[in-house]
């Protein structure tokens, strides 16, 4: 699958519907992180500084908001590759010392896709476009 111009536009549109249409963003983030930690309980250890042990704390909720804000920016930049690559390099520098495995990025990708599908409905969700475009984003954050 590719993250070409049409896929990028579709992902941007579906993300705007799931994340940016007045839905409760905190609830959306809670849905995603609940699934991340259900699928990869050991990932909580990566979030000790922001209370990954309890996703209901203000510290973790603030972190979840920052993560979704960063993802929102990356998705918005999907059709501006030069600026996207600069943003991904910045995120890569923030994540390189954190010890996040490729498998853990996959869990986050899957949880984000579940969250978007949950919000917009399975009949319109384009899994192939999301997989390809999230691979571009997480690959960039991993420095690939």
Swiss-Prot record:
GO terms for molecular function: heme binding; iron ion binding; oxygen binding; oxygen carrier activity. GO terms for cellular component: extracellular region; hemoglobin complex. Pfam families: Globin. Coiled coil: none annotated. It comes from the Eukaryota. Gene3D superfamilies: Globins. Heme b binds at residue 95. Keywords: Heme, Iron, Metal-binding, Oxygen transport, Transport. Residues 2-144 form the Globin domain. PROSITE patterns: GLOBIN. The keyword Iron applies. Giant hemoglobin is composed of four heme-containing chains (AI to AIV), and two linker chains (AV and AVI). Belongs to the globin family. This is Giant hemoglobin AIII chain. It comes from Lamellibrachia sp. (Deep-sea giant tube worm). The lineage of its organism: Eukaryota, Metazoa, Spiralia, Lophotrochozoa, Annelida.
């Amino acid at each position: 699958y590719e993250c070409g111009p049409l896929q990028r536009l579709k992902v941007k549109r579906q993300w705007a519907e799931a994340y940016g249409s007045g839905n409760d963003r905190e609830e959306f983030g809670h849905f995603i992180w609940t699934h991340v930690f259900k699928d990869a309980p050991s990932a909580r250890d990566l979030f000790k500084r922001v209370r990954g042990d309890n996703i209901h704390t203000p510290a973790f909720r603030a972190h979840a908001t920052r993560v979704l804000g960063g993802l929102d920016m990356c998705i918005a930049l999907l059709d501006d590759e030069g600026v996207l690559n600069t943003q991904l390099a910045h995120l890569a520098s923030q994540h390189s010392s954190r010890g996040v495995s490729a498998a853990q990025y996959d869990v986050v990708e899957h949880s984000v896709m579940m969250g978007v599908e949950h919000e917009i409905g399975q009949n319109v969700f384009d899994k192939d476009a999301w997989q390809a475009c999230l691979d571009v984003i997480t690959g960039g954050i991993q420095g690939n």
